[in-house]
Amino acid sequence: MAKQSGIKWLWLSLVVITLDLFSKYLVVERFELYESINILPIFNLTYARNYGAAFSFLADHSGWQKYLFLTLAIIISFILANVLRRNQIDQKRENMAYALIIGGAIGNAIDRAYRGYVVDFFDFYWHIYHYPVFNIADVAIVMGAGLLILETFLDKKKKSD
């Protein structure tokens, strides 16, 4: 019997996309732009718009970056979906990582295509120093990248044993 493909992990991408888009919908519907609600002494929910990439990279350009980031998200998602298709279903950490990255990339791409920008709202700070505002899709991408790094170290350790 043939082994099952890792493509079945795309369910996780759908969960990320759903949570991401729903959270952004709630923020846009209930907050004014730049409105902030303090949740903890180091954390606010703040409605911000990001016209660029991570940390608002290229946000101050004339609009071409929207198409660049959309194209990159689509290409990366297709490449990673192909990797999932080739992986075995039991490669859990690696498949989970790719699915998280795909979900985050598509969540932000949908936002960018629909609105022309990405809605961000998680605002962590210490005194007057604010970390760049981000969203659930960004968290998924970072978690996926972190899992890939972890998998690399664990794989090296396993091979050396």
Curated annotation (Swiss-Prot):
The organism's place on the tree of life at top rank: Bacteria
GO molecular function: aspartic-type endopeptidase activity
Organism: Haemophilus ducreyi (strain 35000HP / ATCC 700724)
EC number: 3.4.23.36
Membrane topology: Multi-pass membrane protein
Pfam families listed in its UniProt record: Peptidase_A8
Name by which UniProt lists this protein: Lipoprotein signal peptidase
Keyword set, alphabetical order: Aspartyl protease, Cell inner membrane, Cell membrane, Hydrolase, Membrane, Protease, Transmembrane, Transmembrane helix
The reaction(s) this protein catalyses: Release of signal peptides from bacterial membrane prolipoproteins. Hydrolyzes -Xaa-Yaa-Zaa-|-(S,diacylglyceryl)Cys-, in which Xaa is hydrophobic (preferably Leu), and Yaa (Ala or Ser) and Zaa (Gly or Ala) have small, neutral side chains
Top EC class, one word: hydrolase
Signal sequence coordinates: none
InterPro entries per the UniProt record, alphabetical: Peptidase_A8
Transmembrane segments: 9-29, 64-84, 96-113, 133-153
Cellular component annotations (GO), alphabetically ordered: plasma membrane
Role, per record: This protein specifically catalyzes the removal of signal peptides from prolipoproteins.
Active-site annotation: D120, D138
Pathway: Protein modification; lipoprotein biosynthesis (signal peptide cleavage)
Keyword Transcription on entry: no
Main location class: membrane
Example GO biological process: proteolysis
Subcellular location: Cell inner membrane
Family of this protein: Belongs to the peptidase A8 family.
